[in-house]
């Protein structure tokens, strides 16, 4: 758990990070957040949807680095939403980052509502990724962009052994 997350007093990242130049977990996590923001082309005119925001650490970074007009977060885990809202209040960002509880596969938003839809290392939790992408395209404005940093977990070891056995016996 601690090897894959940067949990410090000030930062609650839940991503694996981008380690090209980083030398600490916190720096790597922030680097991945910034990389995704750059690849998405975040800018001050954007209305951004962050799906599966965890503790919304990336939303704070995107707000400070790219200054989008608005960030709305959607997360299915009530305890994470509560903690993230409390943290945004502590940082004075409750009016700038709107965090909501809801599903990535049944988004409570009208069609063509957002300029950018972001998902930072959370899509592997969605049931299913295809349903998430369908919803993401539905809420995306024409000309908008979806930016996803994803993880593809390996199957359990016993599954790999079974496949190996089937292939070679």
Stretch-by-stretch model annotation:
Residues 1-17:
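N-terminal, positively charged/glycine-rich alpha-helical extensions of SAM-dependent methyltransferases
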Residues 105-117:
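A short acidic, Gly/Pro-enriched loop at the edge of an enzyme's catalytic core
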Residues 49-106:
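Class I SAM-dependent methyltransferase SAM/SAH-binding core
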Residues 27-44:
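Conserved alpha-helix/loop element of class I SAM-dependent methyltransferases that forms part
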Residues 148-150:
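Acidic carboxylate diad motif detector
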Residues 130-145:
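A short glycine-rich, Lys/Arg-flanked "PGG" loop and its adjoining helix->strand segment in the class I
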Residues 116-128:
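A short SAM/SAH-binding and catalytic strip from SAM-dependent methyltransferases
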Residues 152-169:
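Short, glycine-/aromatic-enriched active-site segment of Class I SAM-dependent methyltransferases
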